[in-house]
Amino acid sequence: MSDQPAQSDLPDQGALPPQEAAQPQAVREDPQPQQCAQQVLFEQQGAQHRVYISNLSQDATEEALTEFLKDFHPVSVLIPSQSVRGFQKTSVRPLGIAYVEFKDADTAAKVILELNGVTFMDRELRLRYHIPFKSEKEKLARGPNKFRQIQRRLSELRRRNSDAGATVTTDNGPQVDAAAVPREMSKVTIYVGRLPGRTTDKDLRTYFHEYLPQEIIVFKHRQFRGWRIRRHVTAAVITFPDHERQESALESLSNLPFNGRTVRMAPAFEDKLAEIRAEVQRMAVEQQLPQPASNLGIYIGNNLIAMQPLQTRKADQQSLQSQHSPQNAAEDQTITAPPPSQQQLPQLQPIAPPLSLQPLNPVENTQPVQGLDLSIPREHEEVVRGQPLLRLQKLQMIQRLQRLHRQKQRQQIQQEPAAQPAAQPAAQPATEAAVAPQLVPEQEAHQAAAQAEPQQVLERPIAAGA
């Protein structure tokens, strides 16, 4: 640890300027194997000999890990553990991490590049440089936020590697670099930000109706305020016929509230506008939506997320005509039962015309449906399932079938009592006449048997005495 090599001897340090090498570098908890080169590039100031290993198996020991790293000749291997106290005994459990120290920085960098993501005891190892602990006083004395410094350095590296300039993130917020190419502003499209969350393109079209807006796209994007604070902001881009109407809208409506909220208006960027339109077209093709992009509302998070249609389409005339086709009318007629004979049930009302000829009255039909039993009689179940009708027509048809079923039950109940009293008066005398002759011989036989028994009893003693 005491032998520190020179700054020029470090691998990958020659690609960085001297003023950037002294800045703290980005370190990720779980880097991917393909990102190891970037991680070695973003090492801390000075040489690093100690490597931090995470996602280590609970069964791994220091001897097994030393044997696994024997090709790199580790100086020391440490697997920290913790003591868990129970009611009867205390157990020691490893933390699943390890600290391995090597003899030089080149070996540590080679270990990170080659073994990051390698499986050891059924676990993929995660390797990075060890970050020494620093007290709160050292953190306060360090100056600006480390995360912002890392973001600024990454932005500078991206800007140097790209042909076109981009924004550079500083401590005071996003600022445009002086060497970057200025972004082109649209001459007919404006950006409207800080809109209410439920704003639709119809509301904006009404608000800008004097300036004849041609295209309105509503979207949402995320704003990051710090490491954990995020919020969604509703915005829109509005395209006008010419540059004069764009300037008039910006001058007259910039300071006026929209639905009780002060909005932000400015000319839109051409590159951002092209990105939004391309995303709208792509999502429209994927979802196979027939309406144009100007009638669509979208959510764009991180500047592009899910689709939100803002207008409903009118019903197709062909679908309405197909519902009232002659074939459906013939099927409706098959549902109606034949009228009962007037001789049996003169009090029943005549059957109503088919459903296709009846006027639809939602007020009349929706009230009794609340407590309605939607069970369909078995004899009409197949007919109901084959009808491509609307919801209101289906409810009317179910009511009609249930009324027919109840009428049929009442008809059967009324016919059965009417048949029984007519047959009983004629059958009753015949049964009495048939039973009466049978009772007379039986009574005479019992009387004769009763008279004959005493005589037999008296005759037996006489015969015995004789």
Curated annotation (Swiss-Prot):
Keywords: Repeat, RNA-binding, Transcription, Transcription regulation. GO terms for molecular function: mRNA binding. SMART domains: RRM. Belongs to the RRT5 family. Residues 317-336 have a biased composition (Polar residues). Residues 1-33, 311-347, 406-466 are annotated as: Disordered. It comes from the Eukaryota. Pfam families: RRM_1. PROSITE patterns: RRM. This is Regulator of rDNA transcription protein 5. Residues 49-132, 188-270 form the RRM domain. May be involved in the modulation of rDNA transcription. The gene is RRT5. InterPro entries: Nucleotide-bd_a/b_plait_sf, RBD_domain_sf, RRM_dom, Rrt5_RRM1, Rrt5_RRM2, RRT5_SRSF_SR. CDD domains: RRM1_RRT5 (cd12409), RRM2_RRT5 (cd12410). Residues 17-26, 410-456 have a biased composition (Low complexity). One of its GO terms (cellular component) is nucleus.
